[in-house]
Amino acid sequence: MLRIIHTADIHLGARHDDLGEQAAAQRERQFAAFKAAIDLAIAEKADLFLIAGDLFDSNVQPRRSVERVAAEIKRLTVARIRTVIIPGTHDVFDRVSIYRAYDLATMAGATAGDGMVTVLDPDHASVHLASLDLLVLGQVFDTKRAPHSPLHGMGPAVVAQGATPGARAPTWRVGLVHGSISIPGKTEHDDVVITADEIAASGLDYLALGHW
């Protein structure tokens, strides 16, 4: 049985200017929640830890904060739990992205080609985890407003990037998306929206969502 822990929208490093002197305490509570999710993944012997966007509240973070986050993810690496991350709308993959500034995978103990920590980007939006017989399909934009549905191109016929033609498809297909499900009267002005029909047509075994 495949065990997945999925989280999103932790917004680490949020300024919380409106909280005044309580801002630092709130940031620590958010970090504690992130640590608790990793504790759970290790305790449950999860196979895969997914972060569906907005791990960070913005792309401007001090190095010590990124190192602190990487140290937590490294606990998953040591436990042989694979981690896949997509940028969101707060930590968007633009030209000043935090994921361009820092090699989070290496900082978290992953080595080239081991697949232990993967940060998806617009040019590498999927990853085949052969040891889990699983394909993670992501959608990463370089702007906060999506130019098309985050589920675009995730149909059942999609194969892993670089897959050998004719190779057997992985047993599991997991989507990793930062976006909202369309709700009449609530999501008309949202930047990233998907519909229930798009989800059904994707043929995904599991869809890990973030945003709200």
Residues of each region from the PLM?
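His/Asp/Glu-rich metal-coordinating catalytic cores
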Residues: L48, N59-W212
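N-terminal active-site segment of His-dependent metallophosphoesterases
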Residues: M1-E67, T164
